[in-house]
């Protein structure tokens, strides 16, 4: 992209740290960069003296909305497990933090937090292991809906359907039937399409030499909403 002499890059990085040196080269070459979806690591950006605007939701807030809703269905002291995304990514870390905020506030016991790598199969394996190790588990909080799908299968295979609640994040199409029939209690919609639109709009402004409207943390915050049974 840098060699192609583009004017701007809108990037949703899989890793919050790995691409920062490349983006430093891009900005040094005069290319405007906007970060969407998964926020680049703030400390790594600072180490490269980079200021890259981020367009995306408050993942921690979104996960807390989901966790708060789940907590209303639980009893203080209940055991829960968290299936995290890729642990090195900012959005995974923030969602886990939001889940823990809600569980701590409601006095639930988080007995395990393990990475499911955002994947159905890995989420299933992690959920199965948790259900086996913690027979009193009452809920599984998955950092995305793909892992929630895997968790639902694990709950069914363990013979605990209706006894262990599952929540997710993203509101993908595949999760909607499960919300409807109760296999998944709740998820969060972060309107990914809006992130892309806002990201492109911000990039175009920067190319024109205009300022983008960010908060004091350099963020253009996009909506995130709790989604429950229709």
Roles of regions detected by a PLM:
Residues 8, 13, 52-53, 79-86:
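Short beta-strand segments enriched in small/hydrophobic residues
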Residues 62-66, 90-109, 122, 126, ...:
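Short, solvent-exposed amphipathic alpha-helices that sit
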Residues 34, 81, 111, 141, ...:
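Structural detector of well-ordered beta-strand residues that form the stable sheet scaffold
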Residues 22-61, 72, 79, 172-180, ...:
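Flexible loop/hinge segments that line or gate small-molecule binding clefts
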Residues 55-57, 81-90, 111, 115-117:
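Short beta-strand->loop
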Residues 53-80, 122-123, 171-175, 191-208:
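Hydrophobic alpha-helical segments within soluble ligand-binding/sensing domains
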Residues 83-87, 91, 101-103, 194-230:
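Hinge/cleft segment of the Venus flytrap/periplasmic-binding protein
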Residues 7-28, 99, 111-112, 116-177:
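Hydrophobic alpha-helical
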């Amino acid at each position: 992209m840098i060699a192609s002499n583009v004017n701007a890059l809108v990037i949703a990085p899989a890793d919050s740290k790995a691409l920062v040196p490349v983006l430093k080269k891009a900005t040094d070459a005069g290319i405007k960069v906007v970060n969407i979806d998964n926020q680049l690591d703030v400390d790594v950006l600072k180490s490269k003296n980079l200021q890259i605007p981020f367009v995306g939701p408050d993942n921690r807030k979104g996960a807390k909305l989901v966790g708060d809703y789940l907590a209303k269905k639980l009893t203080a002291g209940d055991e829960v497990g968290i299936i995290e995304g890729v642990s090195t990514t900012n959005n995974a870390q923030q969602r886990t933090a939001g889940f823990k905020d809600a569980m701590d506030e409601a006095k639930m016991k988080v007995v395990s937090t393990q990475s499911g790598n955002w994947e159905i199969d890995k989420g299933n394996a992690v959920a199965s292991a948790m259900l086996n190790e913690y027979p009193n588990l009452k809920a599984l909080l998955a950092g995305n809906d793909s892992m929630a799908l895997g968790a639902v299968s694990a709950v069914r295979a363990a013979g605990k359907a209706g006894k262990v609640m599952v929540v997710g994040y993203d509101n993908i199409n595949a999760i909607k039937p499960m919300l409807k029939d109760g296999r998944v209690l709740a998820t969060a919609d972060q309107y990914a399409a809006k992130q892309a639109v806002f990201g492109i709009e911000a990039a175009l402004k920067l190319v024109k030499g205009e300022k983008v409207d960010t908060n004091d943390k350099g963020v253009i915050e996009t909506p995130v909403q709790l989604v429950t049974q229709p």
